């Protein structure tokens, strides 16, 4: 969502009834998973305050519902399943786009995805974890279908 939310303007221009669900895990969780699985650690994919040099402080809270309000959407912030169920029921009654700011725990993404993603990785590194991840990437490339 933070990478590109200009689609909301198009939704509003066209008066479309769209439900937008944002799973707020305090970062780019999918990219963080890729980094961690490739042995390189997090490269600022968690939204944290810095100590002046590195983002190692507390997580930065973002109120995505307020961003949606700024665009004129009906918004909901949900911390529990019950809040989400109630918000979904209310959203059915709305005649405009709705945004759901779903507060989830960091690092609670679905693992695996039952697929393979060819992500570039260093072929030489001082870190054993990167060298091992590189072996996995090279093996995956050998097994990948050519289209």
What is the role of each PLM region?
Residues 1-147:
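Thiamine diphosphate
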């Amino acid at each position: 969502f933070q990478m590109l939310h200009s689609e909301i303007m198009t939704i509003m221009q066209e008066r479309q009834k769209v439900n937008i669900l944002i799973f707020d895990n305090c970062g780019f969780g999918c990219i963080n998973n890729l980094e961690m699985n490739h042995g390189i650690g997090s490269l600022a994919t968690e939204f944290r305050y810095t100590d002046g040099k590195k983002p190692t402080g507390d997580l930065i809270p973002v109120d995505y519902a307020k961003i949606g309000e700024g665009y004129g959407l009906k918004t909901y912030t949900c911390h529990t399943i019950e809040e989400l169920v109630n918000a979904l029921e209310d959203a059915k009654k709305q005649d405009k786009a709705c945004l759901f700011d779903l507060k989830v725990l960091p690092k609670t993404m679905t693992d695996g995805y039952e697929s393979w993603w060819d992500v570039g990785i260093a072929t030489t590194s001082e870190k054993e974890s990167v060298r091992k991840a590189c072996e996995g990437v090279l093996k995956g490339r050998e097994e990948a279908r050519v289209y």
